[in-house]
């Protein structure tokens, strides 16, 4: 089956030329990475935001610039299930994801393998039918990688610590046997005043950089940080640590208020790499 885009023309442009122009303008944006060369050796995974490109695209480009020389065969993308449809944790098989930049194959072999290795992951295409969290990452990946790659999409309704440990370990098992990049799709604080969002997210980013998952969940709960993809970030932290990463590095943090000027109610965006 072809998984048609559900937010093309909304979160990002719906035509190839406009989308390519938009991604380039995000790179050159004052909050984007620009053309500087980044040292991207030894990166195991990244965190990237998933809002409309006009808001979070410049920050997302930091994550993608950091992995742009990698050319992986497989990109494992984990993100939250905003609509709560389908299974608690789901991947899919026998599918392609369509964007204005073309089709990307799902790695069905990897999907079956990870579903066997995990207590949580099930194969269910319906879970992926409405959500944008994985979709918005794919055009960015298509634009930076010159070689063909496959994806392993994993969407999370359950974002518990127990799930993250199970799924993180299962992701690492897949990554060990393939040339793989891992992406966690998440925004940070939602709909708070700008300075409060900055302080909340600074507190949550600290344990991410330390790759301390238990502390991450403690801060998340104690401060009630409204990061939507916390389970995706935790799973990727666990997977990357399993693969040999020792720390996270913050590449960029912005809010929609920083980018657009309305600071009364903002969403936070972080670009982080695990090395």
Curated annotation (Swiss-Prot):
InterPro entries on file: MEMO1_fam
Top-level taxonomic group: Archaea
PANTHER family hit by this protein: PROTEIN MEMO1
UniProt record similarity statement: Belongs to the MEMO1 family.
Record protein name field: MEMO1 family protein Nmar_0215
């Amino acid at each position: 089956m072809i998984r048609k885009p559900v937010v093309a023309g909304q979160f990002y442009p719906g035509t190839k030329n406009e989308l390519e122009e938009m991604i380039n303008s995000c790179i050159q944006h004052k909050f984007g990475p620009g053309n500087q060369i980044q040292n991207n050796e030894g990166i195991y995974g990244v965190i990237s935001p998933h809002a409309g490109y006009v808001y979070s695209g410049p920050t997302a480009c930091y994550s993608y610039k950091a992995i742009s020389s990698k050319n992986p065969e497989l990109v494992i993308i984990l993100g939250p299930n905003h609509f709560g449809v389908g299974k608690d944790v789901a991947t899919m098989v026998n599918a392609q994801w369509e964007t204005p930049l073309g089709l990307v194959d799902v790695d069905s072999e990897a999907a079956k393998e990870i579903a066997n290795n995990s207590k949580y992951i099930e194969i269910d295409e319906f879970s992926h039918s409405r959500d944008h969290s994985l979709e918005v990452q794919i055009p960015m990946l298509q634009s930076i990688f010159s070689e063909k790659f496959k994806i392993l999409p994993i969407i999370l309704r359950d974002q518990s610590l127990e799930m993250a440990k199970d799924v993180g370990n299962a992701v690492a098992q897949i990554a060990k046997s393939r040339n793989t990049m891992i992406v966690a799709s998440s925004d940070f604080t939602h709909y708070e005043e700008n300075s409060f969002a900055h302080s909340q997210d600074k507190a949550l980013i600290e344990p991410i950089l330390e790759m301390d998952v238990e502390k991450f969940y403690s801060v998340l709960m104690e401060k009630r940080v409204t990061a939507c993809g916390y389970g995706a970030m935790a799973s990727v932290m666990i997977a990357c640590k399993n693969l040999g990463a020792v720390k996270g590095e913050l590449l960029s943090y912005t809010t929609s208020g920083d980018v657009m000027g309305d600071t009364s109610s903002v969403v936070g965006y972080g670009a982080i790499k695990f090395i």
